[in-house]
Amino acid sequence: MTKQEKAENQEKPTEETVEETPKKETPFEPVMEADEVEETTEAQAPVEEADDKLAELQKKYDAMEDSFLRSQAEIKNIQMRNQKEQANLLKYDGQSLAKDVLPVLDNLERALAAEATDESLKKGVQMTYDHMKHALEDHGVKEIEAQGQAFDPTIHQAVQTVAVDGDQKADTVVQVFQKGYYLKDRVLRPAMVVVAQ
């Protein structure tokens, strides 16, 4: 080839096509130098310590909050129990006084049952009895109905048993020796009774 042919070849574009492969874009990864890596590790250490302390403090906080809530609930329960006990004390406040007065009421009943020659004396005893019974009823003391009722060991005290007679039913109160009384819903004194067997 002559020089002229070489020049022509250079000027003519060749028909060969070269396919270019597209380059993939890689994400930018900063290259850290050794000093920068050490600084990052040193900076992360206090952050990790702070995270650990925070987690520990959170656990302590949760435990204290739980303890606080339990204590509050216990205090509320104690207060409610206290109120209930006070209500019961007020409800049954006169129990010992009523127990002491019941024998006096029994004696007044016996005096009224006895034959009296002086009508004015009997009338005075009756008035005293009525007044005392009314005062006791005002404070929640009421008589236990026993005569003719089925025997109930929670409110009756059997002092004697007798054979069933005529139209009587077994386990029925046939006679009352001493009246029994309630104080509100509590048995103050059981009735002393005779029971048919």
Curated annotation (Swiss-Prot):
One of its GO terms (molecular function) is adenyl-nucleotide exchange factor activity. Keywords: Chaperone, Cytoplasm, Stress response. GO terms for biological process: protein folding. Residues 1-27 have a biased composition (Basic and acidic residues). It is found in: Cytoplasm. Signal peptide: none annotated. PROSITE patterns: GRPE (PS01071). GO terms for cellular component: cytoplasm. InterPro entries: GrpE, GrpE_coiled_coil, GrpE_head. It holds the Pfam family GrpE. Disulfide bonds: none annotated. Residues 32-41 have a biased composition (Acidic residues). NCBIfam families: PRK14140.1, PRK14162.1. Homodimer. Participates actively in the response to hyperosmotic and heat shock by preventing the aggregation of stress-denatured proteins, in association with DnaK and GrpE. It is the nucleotide exchange factor for DnaK and may function as a thermosensor. Unfolded proteins bind initially to DnaJ; upon interaction with the DnaJ-bound protein, DnaK hydrolyzes its bound ATP, resulting in the formation of a stable complex. GrpE releases ADP from DnaK; ATP binding to DnaK triggers the release of the substrate protein, thus completing the reaction cycle. Belongs to the GrpE family. This is Protein GrpE. It comes from Latilactobacillus sakei (Lactobacillus sakei). The gene is grpE.
